């Protein structure tokens, strides 16, 4: 049972003033549900956007037995800025620690001196040219993966959604693999990331051409799965047809996902796409919040649901494509980060975006530090470590939510 009451002020789309949108479910006994007194409301208040006007005082009343994810705020508003600042501070701390972690351990004072141009020449090279670009990329890539995961889970209203759902990361990996297999990566230093980003864009255009602008979520997901399978088959074919074993080995290592041997050239190439994708996703935060009320309610509040889907998919493809272009395939960060943010900040999709980005950055930085410190005969790739940690967590989510997931996608 769910009741939504909204009061509209100044909406240019002919919304009724003080209109009540009610979505009710009959109880098993057949009795009509009656609103509870205000003192017994289980939801909290928050603001949503209705076209050019505003819809204020939206209240969700959900019985305690309802296990569905709702947009009711389960955490006080004042907790959001403090928690978000704390999470970003944690990510920044891990970034600083990553500058000193590695085969050559550096003390904090040595790292600080080398960072500002003092200290010995070897220390400056290690910090400024080797570890600093790696830390910046880990921050940016982890943040866009966490942000994309939170946005997609809000769009689909499904806790198992991840950035790989619509095929952009797989297409980016296929583009990079083709460049490696043909030898262009050795001839042109920027050929690999440019090909990966271009392939991600092509996958989005094909997805939109196949599914159409007003396609529902099921068609978009099916088209995305088909593109993912096609990109995976193309990647396997490129490995199979590699001209020599060394090219096949290079492709395999790249697909494992890593931040090793990255420079500020990679940062300069990937960061604009990551920032552009993040800006698109963050600009649609209020529409994602409204969509949590349901598609019909969101449309009545002035949200163009079809445009919202296209914007979120394009933002995810743009940001994740830029990330995959320089790091390879790194999975499960986008799936795990929003779930770690929800116990702290509730289920409001708009308020989960920034905390999920901070948690994603912290997770990838922690994984990158761990692969440097784990004793092994060869370097463990960061994508392997995130998969080892992420797969059990994914299975746990399936077991926990299998009852609610049996209903399928609406």
Region locations from a protein language model:
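Short linear/disordered segments characteristic of secreted peptide precursors
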Residues: 8-11, 28
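Ala/Thr-enriched low-complexity intrinsically disordered regions
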Residues: 19, 23-24, 38, 42-43, ...
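Alpha-helical transmembrane segments in inner-membrane proteins
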Residues: 46, 50-410
């Amino acid at each position: 049972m769910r009741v939504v009451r909204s009061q509209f002020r100044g909406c240019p789309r002919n919304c009724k003033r003080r209109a009540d949108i009610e979505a009710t479910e009959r109880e098993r006994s057949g009795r009509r549900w009656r609103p509870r007194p205000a003192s017994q409301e289980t939801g909290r208040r928050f603001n949503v956007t209705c076209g050019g006007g505003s819809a204020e005082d939206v209240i969700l009343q959900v019985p305690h037995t309802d296990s569905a994810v709702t947009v009711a705020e389960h955490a006080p508003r004042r907790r959001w800025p403090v928690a978000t600042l704390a999470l970003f501070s944690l990510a920044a701390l891990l970034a600083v620690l990553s500058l000193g972690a590695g085969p050559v351990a550096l003390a904090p004072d040595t790292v600080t001196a080398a960072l500002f141009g003092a200290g010995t020449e070897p220390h400056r090279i290690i910090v400024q040219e080797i570890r600093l670009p790696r830390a910046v990329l880990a921050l940016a890539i982890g943040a866009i993966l966490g942000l994309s995961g939170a946005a997609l889970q809000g769009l689909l209203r499904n806790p198992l959604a991840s950035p790989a759902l619509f095929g952009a990361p797989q297409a980016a990996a296929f583009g990079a693999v083709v460049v490696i297999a043909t030898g262009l990566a050795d001839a042109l230093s920027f050929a690999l990331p440019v090909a990966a980003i271009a392939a991600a864009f092509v996958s989005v255009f094909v997805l939109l051409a196949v599914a159409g602008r007003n396609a529902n979520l099921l068609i978009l997901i099916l088209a995305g799965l088909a593109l993912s399978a096609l990109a995976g088959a193309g990647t396997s074919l490129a490995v199979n047809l590699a001209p020599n074993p060394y090219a096949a080995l290079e492709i395999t290592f790249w697909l494992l996902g890593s931040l090793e041997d990255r420079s500020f050239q990679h940062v300069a190439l990937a960061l604009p796409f990551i920032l552009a994708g993040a800006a698109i996703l963050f600009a649609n935060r209020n529409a994602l919040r409204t969509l949590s009320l349901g598609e019909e309610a969101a449309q009545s509040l002035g949200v163009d649901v079809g445009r919202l889907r296209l914007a979120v998919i394009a933002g995810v493809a743009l940001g994740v494509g830029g990330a995959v272009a320089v790091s390879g395939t790194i999975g499960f960060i986008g799936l795990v980060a929003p779930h770690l943010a929800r116990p702290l900040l509730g289920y409001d999709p708009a308020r989960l975006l920034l905390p999920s980005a901070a948690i994603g950055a912290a997770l990838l930085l922690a994984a990158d530090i761990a692969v440097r410190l784990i004793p092994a005969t060869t370097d463990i790739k960061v994508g392997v470590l995130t998969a080892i940690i992420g797969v059990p967590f994914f299975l746990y989510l399936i077991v926990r939510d299998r009852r609610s997931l049996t209903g399928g996608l609406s």
